[in-house]
């Protein structure tokens, strides 16, 4: 194994591919008990790890990992492998090979996310259900060129091995990726393609250059991009897989001789086109539909005229519409880019999207049935217009072709009417065909793009086909998919087990054949062999009258009980019906054969196909061109539809042909298998279900593959190749210089190598190796080569160094020589003679040098010329060479293509020969059958002639019967009451039938072909046999049959009375009779030939029997009609019952709503008006339905009487036949011998005929039963009618009661309104006081604790206060002076604040009114709220008004009730609309309710404040009681309080009574409010938070103000004058409290939390009473001390009263202003939100307007373009006119016409058309003149006329187009005007809202500023009050001290 350093090349994928070194070392060192460590069988986990505890007598006791101890048999335990084999990469290397070892190895590797594992010769992969980093580019690079044993298991390793085998073995390879659906086949296929596309170009200097204008990406990019495109159109979500391939594909990647990527092609199989129109609930259609609707490319939505909601399209919304693991938006981008990379033109790309959109629109096309016809007609044309537009078709032609297709009858075409269901089936078939042909065409285009014409030598095929599928509903598609997997599994088994072992025997290796039990031939033969499932299916498709039932019967007859793989499924509850089961290798699958014949024949509407062929969309016309399916062009085996022509090739036949071609391709390659496994059914990463994985391992033959890999010799190599490759291991073993056989050489070579010699065997042509040995030899070879190369490198390096050393020595010697010469030269350089030599030497050679230079120049010029010539020749030769090479390549490609074509032609020839043989055999069969039919036909013709003679005689009798029947019908019409007497008449008829039974038996024996009348025939035969008493044996037989018939008759009579209600059994028996009829028809044909020897009298009886049979058939037809009518009546009755129950429930709901009339609105009044009209219409419809039911009952009675009359007619015929037969009795005696021989045959058919007779009688009884049931239905309807009248009266009474209740409520409402107004006023006053006190609280909060301590000290010092009171007089006077000054200043400030607050209040009120007017404009019914938004009871008044209106309408409710019952369905729609309006109005009511809740919150706050005030008042009274002088005044206060208490108690009692009276009404209102509240809560959450925050702030302010007020009161308690003021305050507080309580009780009645508030009020009253009791206790103390402080208190009280009044006024104004500010802020916020909403609407409308304007501009541009085109036409016309000088006038007219078109579009059509016509007339007249004058110009004039006509047509087209554009422009202009008007209105509203908002904001800021100033002034006043309070305490202290 590789070390961690070596695994580093895999990057972050290393831990997901192989165990680390640390883990391997730990596994090797882990203790292991080989004897006791075992796997044991477990019921839940299949196998669990255990430890052996003991072994006894074949039993083993083990302890599992879970700690449980079990005892099992010896054969139920399996030894565990040592720890070093944990997570082993190749399971073939394990010591103990068995199921648990394989299972746990896979499980442990899966837990470590090692999803790939070798299993002998193939690879097993487990779906991880998550992304793992094992496919990164560095992983691809790491696997390139690695041997299998050198790298961890991976799909890249399999791919690289296949690539290397292709290069070394020169053999085509294939990779078969198989497994069940959802196992990960598609992902692994993509990785294989990714690997080949990467390695095949890695290392190249440049990539393949794309052909200009054809490709937009390189070849490898296109190969990779083909996958997302095919996945988008061919993959879908299934139950088991979110990205399941719904088609199979075989991708061949072609390589050149050097391994370079050359080209690729794709073959597809079995596209599941039914998914286009139908999906199961947990599945969805193909990804492309949802990608388009993801809105990632909005231009597609606009182009395809679709929406982004899949539920708007029926074809794609039957299951799920989203997949969590798939991002449809990103996938759309990938798909779109793949289309571009693959070189699709823009038109082709648009066509793909348009056809996909057209398929979606097909699913929305609606059709309905014409009245009184079964013919279908379109139900709206909007969808059809869209679909036709996308397909460039005419919408009317498309609808006409769908509803009235033309079919060929003989040599003529006739128009055929279609039913609604037939039209829907046709639309679905067309949608599926378009999608399938488009998909196959895309594959063809992809193949064309991937075919680069480069030389290719080998290919690697990758097979990815749909996995084995077992659904709840399995159809023909599942059978084809499962059959394909069966064939692939058989191929795997055959390759792994059979071929492997056969090759051993062929090579002469000693081998004992092992049967692994993996043969799947039985199932395959059951499906594909002659008389198999496909064969029977194709045979049934040849017969026009074949049905699914006949197909099922043939399957049962041929295979049920004869083949173990064919079973009859057991019916399962909750699952779809199954007709047969097949035992596949992966499990038993139940198949439903519904619709198989149509799917196999794949019929299409030929008329619509003809439209497709003429479509303006080239792609669509190409798909349906020439009646050939697109798959014929795709070049690959594809599923496709049927092929037109004589062969009538079905879907199953084409599928088998393609499958056989695929198997042939696979057999010609060297396969590599990859087995994909599903770990669990829940798609949970890391979880593995043992039983599921074991099942797949067993089915896939994984264990058997490992065993044969271990036992067999999976590696083999030819002797010559082995000798050539491995000779290097021991070259001395093979002698040099002499010939030696390759086999002997291989034997010597292997014998001389140090290996295990039992691991290989020698065959005749190959040497075979066990697994792993060849890898060992490769390693030895690599080591040997490394040694040899090392030695070679050493020798080479030594040689090179010796050469280099020699050169170095030579250079050394040269250097020495040069140095010697230089030294010598330096010595003689200055010698005079040497100088002279230097001067003379050049002169001696200068002349020779000049000559040489001249010669050299000449030679240079010549050489230059020759070089130029040679260069030119070289270039010419190079060009020729390039051309020749190109021709050579072209010829090679041509030869290769011709060879491929020849091979394909040979294959087709073979197939045609096979087909010819099959067809010849079929022709022989058909010919023989035709001859038999001709013989039978001849016989029947002769019989027919005889029967026609007899028919003439019988017609007279029939006429008489018809006259009788007419009389009976007249009597029946006259007396309908005879229906009740039918039982008596039937009894009489039964007696008549009993008399004629014998005659029926005679006819029955004579004619077996008369199914329903054979009973009478047998009776006749029995009568004849009784007459022949001389023949004893025959008489005994006939008497026995007579007795049986009598018993049968008695049984039939009893059964007739018992089976009156068995309608379902009768229907089943009718089906059986029809089946028996078909069988009897065939038998009767044979019997007719046997009866040919009977005399002419029997033939007469046959004629009579034929007439009777016709009558019986007519009766059966009438019975069926009666049954259909009864079923229709039942359906109508059920519908009426349903409507009645729905209306009853609706009435109950309405009655409940009427009881809750308090919440009714004006919208409900309008809804009631509508319902009144609908109710009247419903009453009329009900009466019409009643009349119709009565008429239907009368019709049924009439038809029943007709059937009875016809039976009487048959009886009369039988009587006449009886008379005739009695006359011929003597003649028939001679024929009894012949008849006796036929008795046995007749008796066999007797049972079937008896059953037929019983069926007829049952049908007769059923008719009676149905008639009685119809009468009972009429009675029930009458009872219902009476009951409805009763209910109507009851409702009238209830309405009267409601009216009285409403009037009472109205009176109560007025009282409540007054009370609520009073409450509102009081609340405002208290709110003002709270806000004023809030400011004081802020400044006094820090003194609160101190004041409380001082208060306690003051209570302790009460006695001292009395002594110090006298001393404080002087200080009190001083304090009074300061206090007066402060009070005056504070009064002025408060007056100023009051003015500002009044101004702010007025502005706030104006703002509220503006906002209310905005709100009221939303609905007409809210107009009354414009000036009353501030009033909290506005909505209650409006509801009461609506209630009063409803009371008035209630009086006419009886009429409304009847009308509602007839118009229930329409009423539901209106009800929903009215409910929406009611919810809108309830929203407004809820807003008012929120305001109420706010007021209640304020009320609760006030109550708490009042409680605190009362507590503090009690404290004050305790302090005041120290005065003790005013006890009498306090007693008066007590009396007054008692009086107020009694008044409050009375008010509370009155409130409780009125509360109980109104409680029911409020509860009902609360229910409606609660319903509305849930919808509005989320909208007002933000506002509620703001309001709550403001409430909390106000509460804190109020509390602080209250504490401040308490401190003020305590500071003034020292003065006796404060006492009376405090008493006055107390009285005022009590009065306000009483008013507040009464108002709270009244408000509680209208709100949800009324009772709670009432309890709070009661508690408040109790607190007041307790406060009064406290006051009583303090009276004595107050009286004793009051006299001392009276004088001072009076003076202080006067000043304090004045200040207090000013303070209260200012506080009320301040509080009122704060409340107004808050309301203003809230209204302003809502107004801003409204403004934002309006701005958003305006922006949206502006966007829409811009789009519309843009469309108008486009239309104008089109019009201009049309004008331009018209101008061009005129110019062309002018050119034509120039050919003759006489056409100049026409030219001017046309030019003038074109100019007019340019200036006025409206007049373009008329001017161009009229001008064109006039010019044509003039031109034709002029041409006739010119023909006589100028013969030479005749040809040109004719051409001019032709051109003029052409231009005339184009001008007409342009004028028509111009007119259409003009209309569009006008329509768009109108729409633009309307939208502009709306925009202007919105703008005005927005501007008004903005102005109002700005005004309100300014007012708000101003008021806020004033409020801040008032607060500052209040703070100053409070500080002064605090100073006075301190001084008051000092005075108080002094007074106490003095006392």
Swiss-Prot record:
Which segments does the entry list as coiled coil?
A: 843-1939
Residue list for modification N6,N6,N6-trimethyllysine = 130
**Quaternary context:** Muscle myosin is a hexameric protein that consists of 2 heavy chain subunits (MHC), 2 alkali light chain subunits (MLC) and 2 regulatory light chain subunits (MLC-2).
Residues carrying Phosphotyrosine:
389, 424, 1464, 1492
| IQ domain span | 785-814
Does Phosphoprotein appear among the keywords?
yes
Segments forming domain Myosin motor: 86-782
Write out the residues that bind ATP. 179-186
Protein name per Swiss-Prot or TrEMBL: Myosin-4
Q: Where is this region: Actin-binding?
A: 659-681, 761-775
Q: Which SUPFAM superfamilies match?
A: Myosin rod fragments, P-loop containing nucleoside triphosphate hydrolases, Tropomyosin
Domains: entry comment: The rodlike tail sequence is highly repetitive, showing cycles of a 28-residue repeat pattern composed of 4 heptapeptides, characteristic for alpha-helical coiled coils. Limited proteolysis of myosin heavy chain produces 1 light meromyosin (LMM) and 1 heavy meromyosin (HMM). HMM can be further cleaved into 2 globular subfragments (S1) and 1 rod-shaped subfragment (S2).
Set out the biological process GO terms recorded for this chain's protein: muscle contraction
**Protein family per UniProt:** Belongs to the TRAFAC class myosin-kinesin ATPase superfamily. Myosin family.
Q: Which UniProt keywords apply?
A: Actin-binding, ATP-binding, Calmodulin-binding, Coiled coil, Cytoplasm, Methylation, Motor protein, Muscle protein, Myosin, Nucleotide-binding, Phosphoprotein, Thick filament
- Organism listed in the record: Canis lupus familiaris
Highest classification ranks of the organism: Eukaryota, Metazoa, Chordata, Craniata, Vertebrata
Segments of skewed composition (Basic and acidic residues): 1128-1147
